[in-house]
Design a protein with these regions (language model features):
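Short, small/hydrophobic-residue-rich motifs at membrane-helix boundaries and re-entrant hairpins
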Residues: 1-145, 149, 156-172, 176-198
């Protein structure tokens, strides 16, 4: 039987906390770039100037986009490693175990609608919708290919799209009779509650 919304939301939160902790731990093992520290300090100084009214909003946005683009360029190794970890956790592990850690703890399982074995297409589509995988991949390339202003605008637009996808999926899980989210429909998969017998 399809899992109820509260169990799915709790599983999502567990997964988010777990993957955030993993990424934080990994960040300690990736060599630090001293430029990033200086750029972060510059962003803080710039923000303080903007808050004090010392610079205009357009100047702030222009400078901020330069700093942000530079920081993300400097952090490319960490960003690539993060995407690899996200792919392993949200795409590969569910194929093998039919669940992420959060779903396993909540006794949920991801299956295909047609009851065949999950494949990479199913889990990749799920991850694009609710885990921000495509957002992460696109931003790695964008920071290398476009100007800092276009990069900032792209981040805002992509972030907004990702937010809308997650909220849409949440409302679908909460209010649809079959409890399917957008990721379930697009990937032709369902999340079932292993504790509930049909």
């Amino acid at each position: 039987m399809c899992a109820n919304a509260s169990k799915r939301i709790i599983a999502y939160i567990i997964d988010f906390i777990f993957i955030s902790a993993i990424l934080m731990i990994v960040s300690y093992f990736i060599p630090k770039n001293s430029n990033v520290e200086f750029l972060n300090k510059d962003i803080n100084d710039l923000t303080e100037q903007a808050l004090n009214g010392e610079i205009t909003f357009s100047s702030y946005a222009s400078e901020y986009s330069n700093y942000l683009s530079s920081i993300d360029s400097e952090n490319v190794v960490y960003n690539v490693v993060s995407v690899i970890i996200i792919i392993i956790y949200y795409v590969i592990i569910p194929i093998i175990f039919k669940a992420t850690l959060g779903k396993y703890i909540m006794k949920l399982e991801i299956t295909r609608e047609d009851t065949k074995k999950l494949n990479i297409f199913n889990t990749f589509i799920r991850s694009i919708v609710v885990d921000g995988l495509l957002y992460s991949i696109i931003t790695i390339f964008l920071v290398q290919l476009v100007s800092s202003k276009i990069y900032l605008i792209s981040l805002i637009i992509l972030g907004f799209i990702q937010f809308i996808l997650v909220i849409t999926s949440l409302f679908m899980i909460l209010y649809r009779h079959d409890k399917k989210g957008l990721q379930d429909i697009l990937s032709k998969s369902i999340v079932i509650d292993k504790e509930v017998k049909e």
